[in-house]
């Protein structure tokens, strides 16, 4: 067993290998405080025949026992991955994927298992570090290691690896990962911070995780397995020359077409023609031809951009595609918008709900509720393809979370706008940057629904082409530019600052200056888009949709909650059935009444106020005789509140039989004489006009 330790943000970070999971190629136990994550890496020694992509799988899983819990449900065991697990799996995948050598297509699986967790820090950083360490000691070809850190911004200062408590007061939650030389991945949400603060946060995190990289390198030197004797496939030079001569002019013609579907069809025709001419019946040779065509395409697109020629669709490097915006496009929804940017289009719908519609999240750290949900759907027809339709894939979950982060910073507080909010983005067309179209559409749909956002939010995706010292930063990238470029850099925010930033870099050598230029170019693009959005809708509509619930909030004495609920829920059930309103009661006495019909909500409010009203001594009430006894009658003066009208208090004259003066159901006016310590009420009809 080999163990290494390093001080990381004021906490001891420990890496251990050789004690657990010894049959995996690489296994590292990462711990900090009471949080422990076991990360394993296993690779296949042989590539599958015909494999033409790198099959890397990353699975992050949280075990309930890690927090001393037993899973819910009938089977009492962990089920499908939670959203948190899916997002963390993507977080690990993104910075390690570019570090495997080109041409390496053997299957690799990384599994990170949270086996113990405290309530102080998120295990995701430990899982990222563990994945890097497990690969570093495994012998699998990997050009790492990487380090990772979380950065907060509190009271004007950067904080490394903040606790959950610190994050509640932070203006920034940023995760950065990279190698010694370069930043490879950034994921963040922010409270409208400037581009300068965001860039400094990235550089701060990169500097702070360098000791972690050194520790992983020390662990690998001492405990690492011999590196695999893997050699990149040898290129067929003669075939390369033949394919290049034949295909280059055809591919140049294809990339001269600015319309995506026409271009895709032409590229497909070229690929089929080259496969027929050079592929023969050898599957390996066919793979080589496809790989050569991909290289030629990459060279054509990148070369044109670096030479200053127009991009694939005819734009220069800083121009945003044409944008059309419509708000209120669906008649019965609470809010909707159709946002179209070039060949990317999103139909975004906002729905207002009550507290009962909030999402309940059962995490290792405890149960919580989320009043804001954003769901992103990417159907196959959006790219002119067929495919499976069903539960969301990892990509859809990741894009939805990015858009949610972008919008969350401008939402009103629960006290300002007591609604739960669900936004759904249906991507109808896609040619790059559909997640940023979702951000723009979500902002518009929420404002169309009457949500008082602090400011409109827009997003833009940036790209980078870099060859040696030459580089070009691209605004509003297309899908092809994303695939063939060196960086995918999404920035969302308001006129005041950044609310979300996501960056994936595929190469080394991205300098601070390049990132600064990309951020400033993104700001210009964002402001342009916001100007167009503001021309359609610049703030929340003054009124809610006719079909949205109206919410009334009142405060009652917590001791009176039982009066509103009634025995077995009888009273509140009757209230909801008779008024049609939805009623939610918190333990602190906050009552939320929701109803599409405003009058129904007002009626429910009046009845709750009567149910919880205190009976006042010497006050006259209009009551109803509930039950007659030999010694008097019980009179209901408020809902659920009966008082005793003694036979001696019915009249100034002597009463021998109560039935001579009162009948059940009779309306009477009574005065409260006394409310004793047990809450019993004494009433009188004497000297009160009936």
Curated annotation (Swiss-Prot):
It catalyses: RNA(n+1) + phosphate = RNA(n) + a ribonucleoside 5'-diphosphate. Involved in mRNA degradation. Catalyzes the phosphorolysis of single-stranded polyribonucleotides processively in the 3'- to 5'-direction. It is found in: Cytoplasm. GO terms for biological process: mRNA catabolic process; RNA processing. The lineage of its organism: Bacteria, Pseudomonadati, Pseudomonadota, Acidithiobacillia, Acidithiobacillales. The keyword rRNA processing does not apply. Keywords: Cytoplasm, Magnesium, Metal-binding, Nucleotidyltransferase, RNA-binding, Transferase. Residues 618-686 form the S1 motif domain. Pfam families: KH_1 (PF00013), PNPase (PF03726), RNase_PH (PF01138), RNase_PH_C (PF03725), S1 (PF00575). It comes from Acidithiobacillus ferrooxidans (strain ATCC 23270 / DSM 14882 / CIP 104768 / NCIMB 8455) (Ferrobacillus ferrooxidans (strain ATCC 23270)). Residues 549-608 form the KH domain. Belongs to the polyribonucleotide nucleotidyltransferase family. HAMAP family: PNPase. This is Polyribonucleotide nucleotidyltransferase. Component of the RNA degradosome, which is a multiprotein complex involved in RNA processing and mRNA degradation. Its EC number is 2.7.7.8. GO terms for cellular component: cytosol. It is an enzyme of class 2 (transferase).
């Amino acid at each position: 067993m080999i163990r290494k330790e390093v001080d990381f943000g004021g906490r001891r970070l420990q890496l251990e290998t050789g004690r657990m999971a010894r049959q995996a190629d690489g296994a590292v136990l990462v711990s900090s405080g009471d949080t422990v994550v076991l990360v394993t890496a296993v690779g296949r020694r042989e590539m599958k025949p015909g494999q033409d992509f790198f099959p890397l799988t990353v699975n992050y899983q949280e075990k309930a026992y890690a927090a001393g819990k037993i899973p819910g449900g009938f089977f009492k065991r962990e089920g499908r991955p939670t959203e948190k697990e899916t997002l963390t799996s993507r977080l690990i995948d993104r910075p390690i994927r570019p570090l495997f050598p080109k041409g390496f297509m053997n299957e690799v699986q990384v599994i990170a298992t949270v086996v113990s967790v405290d309530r102080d820090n998120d295990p995701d950083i430990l899982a990222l570090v563990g994945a890097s360490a497990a690969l570093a000691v495994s012998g699998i070809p990997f050009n790492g290691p990487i380090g990772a850190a979380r950065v907060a911004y509190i009271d004007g200062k950067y904080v490394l690896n903040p606790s959950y408590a610190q994050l509640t007061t932070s203006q920034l939650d940023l995760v950065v990962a990279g190698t010694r030389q370069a930043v490879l991945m950034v994921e963040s949400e922010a409270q409208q911070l400037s581009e300068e603060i965001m860039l400094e946060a990235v550089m701060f995190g990169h500097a702070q995780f360098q000791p972690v990289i050194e520790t992983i390198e020390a662990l690998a030197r001492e405990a690492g397995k011999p590196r695999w004797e893997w050699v990149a496939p040898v290129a067929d030079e003669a075939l390369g020359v033949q394919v290049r001569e034949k295909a280059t002019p055809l591919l140049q013609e294809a990339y001269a077409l600015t319309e995506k579907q026409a271009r895709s069809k032409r590229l497909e025709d070229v690929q089929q023609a080259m496969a027929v001419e050079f592929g023969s019946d050898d599957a390996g040779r066919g793979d080589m031809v496809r790989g050569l065509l991909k290289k030629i395409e990459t060279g054509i697109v990148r070369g044109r951009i670096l030479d200053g020629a127009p991009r694939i669709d005819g734009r220069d490097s800083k121009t945003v595609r044409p944008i059309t915006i419509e708000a209120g496009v669906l008649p019965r929804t609470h809010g909707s918008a159709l946002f179209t940017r070039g060949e990317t289009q999103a139909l975004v719908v906002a729905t207002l709900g009550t507290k009962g519609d909030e999402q309940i999240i059962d995490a290792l750290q405890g149960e919580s509720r989320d009043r804001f949900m954003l769901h992103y759907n990417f159907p196959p027809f959006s790219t002119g393809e067929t495919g499976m339709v069903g539960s969301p894939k990892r990509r859809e979950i990741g894009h939805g979370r990015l858009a949610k982060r972008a919008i969350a910073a401008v939402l009103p507080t629960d006290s300002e706008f007591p609604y739960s909010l669900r936004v759904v983005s249906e991507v109808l067309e896609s040619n790059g940057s559909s997640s940023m179209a979702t951000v723009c559409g979500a902002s518009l749909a929420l404002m169309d629904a009457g949500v008082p956002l602090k400011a409109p939010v827009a997003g833009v995706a940036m790209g980078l082409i870099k060859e040696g010292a030459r580089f070009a930063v691209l605004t509003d990238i297309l899908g092809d530019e994303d695939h063939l470029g060196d960086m995918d850099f999404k920035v969302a925010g308001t006129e005041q600052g950044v609310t979300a930033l996501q960056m994936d870099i595929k190469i080394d050598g991205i300098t601070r200056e390049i990132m600064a230029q990309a951020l400033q170019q993104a700001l210009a693009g964002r402001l342009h888009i916001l100007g167009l959005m503001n021309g359609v809708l610049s703030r929340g509509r003054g009124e809610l949709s006719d079909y949205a619930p109206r919410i009334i909030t009142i405060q009652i004495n917590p001791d009176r909650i039982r009066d509103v609920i009634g025995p077995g829920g009888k009273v509140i059930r009757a209230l909801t059935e008779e008024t049609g309103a939805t009623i939610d009661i918190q333990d602190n006495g906050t009552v939320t009444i929701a109803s599409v019909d405003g009058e129904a909500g007002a009626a429910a409010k009046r009845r709750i106020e009567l149910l919880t009203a205190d009976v006042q001594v010497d006050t006259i009430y209009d009551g109803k005789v509930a039950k007659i006894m030999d010694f008097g009658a019980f009179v209901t003066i408020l809902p659920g509140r009966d008082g005793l009208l003694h036979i001696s208090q019915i009249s100034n004259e002597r009463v021998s039989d109560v039935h001579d003066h009162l009948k059940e159901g009779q309306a009477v006016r009574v005065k409260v004489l006394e409310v004793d310590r047990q809450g019993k009420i004494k009433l009188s009809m004497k000297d009160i006009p009936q």
